[in-house]
Regions:
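Short, solvent-exposed loop/turn segments at the edges of extracellular beta-sandwich modules
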Residues: 311-315
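Exoplasmic/lumenal beta-rich domain surfaces
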Residues: 79, 198-297
Length: 327
């Protein structure tokens, strides 16, 4: 009986330990961090241009909500073939960043071959493995869905006809300024107006107000859209043409200041964030001529690569400018 009792006790303890482990594991997965975590490189898929050229698409997941990490091109931020430098970022923004850059697929590359991006941050090394498997092929509808403009598996003739916006920087591609000195750059954006901004009609707003009059919980959501519960389990993104400037490559630890503050190019889903992934966010107006000036200053000397992104909420176009900063 004593042996049976001990066995029962150990079985119960084992079951409790298993439940506790599951609880701790689930809790750990739900934790969020401002800093100290590593970055996972991500292979997003591959696409084929109209001329038949194939490209691998990459992004990353910075597990921090605030920390931006710099990793120079080399053994800790490099590729397995074709040279370590394939145009990847050296400055990594917080959280999820999708379809950040693409790498031309070598003409001799076969479906069984792999291109590996290795990234080491905070002492942890992770790799992304790119292949030409057919199930990894990506088109514009997939991009719009993955970034949050569409629900999974949804599309329309309008969405399928969407053309990515374009951006042109009205300055020479290489400039030299001093630390702390302001540089003004002007971007010009153009878009086809697709997808259309979701603006509630007057009739729908009136119906919503009538329902809210009889429902205190709904009334609170009308007063504060940030209190609205999520309508989807995947990331959601507001559509509407907007422009974002951000640092793509630069000296480690350097800070770049943009005036006015820029719309975030990374998936900041927190309420009140200046981000198309944030609840109740709306795109700021674009001037009729599509031109937007920005003042930029730098904290450290060195060579910087800045990106300017024109984003319609579903697709985007990037343009880069290189700035040399001296003391």
């Amino acid at each position: 009986m004593r042996i049976a009792h001990c066995g029962l006790r150990f079985a119960v303890c084992g079951a409790l330990a298993a439940v506790l482990a599951l609880h701790v594991g689930a809790r750990a997965q739900s934790l969020s961090y401002t800093k100290g975590q590593n970055i996972a490189p991500a292979y997003e898929g591959w696409e084929q241009a109209t001329d038949g050229t194939k490209y691998f698409l990459f992004g990353y997941m910075n597990r921090n909500w605030e920390e931006e990490i710099d990793v120079p091109v080399g053994p800790e931020n490099g590729f397995s073939i074709g040279g370590v430098d394939q145009g990847q970022p050296t400055h990594f923004l917080p959280r999820r960043n999708r379809f950040v850059f693409r790498v031309k697929v070598p003409p001799t590359f076969k479906e069984k071959d792999e291109l590996i991006w290795t990234l080491t941050t905070h002492g942890k090394t992770e790799k992304a493995y790119a292949t030409l498997r057919p199930d990894y092929i990506v088109d514009d509808v997939v991009k719009a869905s993955e970034t949050g403009a569409l629900g999974a598996g949804t599309s329309s003739p309008e969405v399928r006809g969407n053309i990515p916006p374009t951006v042109h920087i009205e300055e020479v591609k290489a400039r030299s300024v001093k630390v702390g000195e302001e540089l003004t750059l002007v971007s010009e954006v153009k878009d086809d107006g697709i997808p259309k901004r979701r603006v509630p009609s007057r009739a729908s707003l009136q119906r919503l107000q009538e329902r809210a009059a009889a429902d205190p919980a709904l009334a609170a959501q009308v007063r504060n859209p940030g209190m609205q519960p999520p309508t989807r389990i995947t990331v959601g993104k507001s559509v509407g043409l907007h422009v974002s400037w951000f640092l793509y490559r630069g000296p480690a630890g350097a800070k770049v200041t943009f005036d006015p503050p820029q719309v975030k190019a990374w998936e900041d889903t927190r309420a009140g964030a200046n981000s198309p992934w944030a609840p109740a966010w709306t795109a700021p107006p674009i001037p009729a001529d599509g031109k937007l000036p920005v003042k930029i200053s730098f904290s450290e000397p060195g060579t910087y690569v800045l990106r300017c992104r024109a984003d319609d909420g579903a697709l985007f176009g990037d343009e880069e400018v290189t700035i040399v900063v001296t003391k």
